[in-house]
């Protein structure tokens, strides 16, 4: 029991220190994220990389300017395709990494993708890297929280706090990601509508035929 109390005390202290040392960092005029105050920044060829370490893991935030003259994405499917390409690229660059639990999420009014990259190391400690990818017309943002397998049960609060600290300007809206923001009708709904319409048309034709026959009998 005493050991449990000591462990919980240590964890509480670590989280408290982490929370107190967080600093809001502007990636640009539209996107902010909170990092430990000891973060470092590298700026090369239109890419800004912010890195920081905590007692449990590490954080990386990247702003990559998109190519000038980049054509606007038209629909949500186009956005999903772009984000999938980024995920495939991260997985490929990791060597033996496996992208897991890929899912949709939202930050403010924008759509994003979240996933975990698992890197197995049979000779050492396997690594986990949690990601959120955010795409806009002007820039792509990558947020990462990495940690070792031995700490996967300890980092949940810290990882959650890091990703929850991502803040967007109100100027950023869904049409900064793709042009046609109307809700997309699923294929199943379209199929049901088409089938229902077909049945109604067939029924109407049958009714007209029988009505014509009945009229002929009583003529």
Feature-to-residue mapping (PLM):
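Surface-exposed amphipathic alpha-helical segments
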Residues: 28-30, 37-39, 141-183
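C-terminal single-pass membrane-anchor helix
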Residues: 177-219
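Conserved polar/disulfide-associated segments of primarily extracytoplasmic proteins
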Residues: 46-129, 133-135, 141-142, 147
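Sec/Tat signal peptide C-region and signal peptidase I cleavage site
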Residues: 15-19
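N-terminal "mature-domain start" segment
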Residues: 20-47
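Sec-dependent N-terminal signal peptides
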Residues: 4-14
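Soluble, non-membrane globular domain cores that form compact, hydrophobic packing
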Residues: 13, 154-158, 212-219
């Amino acid at each position: 029991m005493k050991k449990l109390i000591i462990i919980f005390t240590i964890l509480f202290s670590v989280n408290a220190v982490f929370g107190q040392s967080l600093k809001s960092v502007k990636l640009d005029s539209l996107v902010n994220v909170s990092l430990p105050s000891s973060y470092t920044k590298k700026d090369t060829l239109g890419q800004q990389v912010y890195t920081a370490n905590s007692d449990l893991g590490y954080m990386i935030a990247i702003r990559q300017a998109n190519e000038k003259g980049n054509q606007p994405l038209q629909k949500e499917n186009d956005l999903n395709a772009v984000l999938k390409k980024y995920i495939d690229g991260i997985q490929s660059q990791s060597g033996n990494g496996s992208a897991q639990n890929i899912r949709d999420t939202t930050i403010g009014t924008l759509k994003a993708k979240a996933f975990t990259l698992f890197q197995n190391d049979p000779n050492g400690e396997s690594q986990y890297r949690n990601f959120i990818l955010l795409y806009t017309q002007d820039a792509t943002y990558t947020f990462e929280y990495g940690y070792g397998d031995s700490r996967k049960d300890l980092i949940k609060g810290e990882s959650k706090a890091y990703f929850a600290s991502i803040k967007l300007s109100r100027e950023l809206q869904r049409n900064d990601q793709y042009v046609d923001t109307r809700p997309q009708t699923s294929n199943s709904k379209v199929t049901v509508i088409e089938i229902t319409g077909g049945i109604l048309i067939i029924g109407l034709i049958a009714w007209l035929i029988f009505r014509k026959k009945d009229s002929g009998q009583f003529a």
